[in-house]
Amino acid sequence: MDFTFTEEQETIAEIARQLFEHRATPEHLTEVEAGAVRYDAALWRELATADLLGIALPENVGGSEHGFLELALLLAEVGWSVAPVPVYATLLLGADTIARHGDEGQRQRYLPDVVTGSRLLTAGLAEPRRSDPTVPATTARRDRDSWRIDGSKEMVPAAQVAHTMLVPAVDDDGVGVFMVDLNADGVELRPVTTTNGEPHADVFLNGAVVSGRDQLNGNGAEMIESLHARALVGLCAIQLGVTERALRIAAAYTTEREQFGRPIGSFQAVQQRMADAFIDVEAIRWTMWQAAWLLGHGRRASREAGIAKFWAGEAGARITATAQQVHGGIGIDTTYPLFRYFLWAKHNELTLGSASAQLARLGAAY
């Protein structure tokens, strides 16, 4: 298992960071957040122009034919800049799943528009009162050459701006994954307020009709398990960027801020907190990259994904709390950039199961 990045992978991360730091400045984020939806369509188009939207997609749909590791690098950069773009929803939950499990017709219908930035995707994994996303309560019943989908999905990322949602549902053969037009009859979106301000909605499906050609073929249970594992690792990649940047901001502040005639970073109590936070960032980093490496090499990694998500949640909360506390009062000032990182870390901690939920799931597997 080699975690050394290639020159091409480092270039992808560098291009993404430069683009996000140029466009997603604190001042610009404040402007975006004052609007109806925290989504920057112009930045999304710039990602398309930079060939970043197709990094993990096949060449025959306009992609760069890279893989999951490159996608994780891009997600980490989203977290570093808390960028207002649906990379996680569109590229990981949606496009990556269609690229791996869709037939050629499905890939050609959906993925070229993703690469150009004109189609946004998402997937609904979480359901009300259900703790295991791999066992959906949503149902799909056959209606001649189509399917009718009934059920609900909660906290669907980017649902307000997405065109299509992937829906795991129980069907005649067990479980399947269906591509649902979010503007179709029988689909109702109810936007929800989130901790980090990112667009999410509860989606209600009341007999929503899906064409037979919009069901992904293959073993549905394996598809959903794989999607869930990749979704967890994607969140961990974002969390790595979030916590690494929060620690960097805190390190700079403790170097510059003086008290009693010297930088507060010279005090032992502050040094200990910062050292513990550094160790926590490294725990998130290496558990995430272990799981991402396995997934990127076509291996199952549900256990490793759960371990990584545990660390992303547990350690992420400690890191951002430390970053705020060494700042004092300015750490929670909404005109200072750190507050966004605390909110993003909390959102990532709880999405698709907290640290305790990951431990419970890991324990139940033995």
Go through each PLM region and give its residues:
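Glycine-rich phosphate/cofactor-binding loops in nucleotide/flavin-utilizing enzymes
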Residues: D2, A13-I15, L73, L93, ...
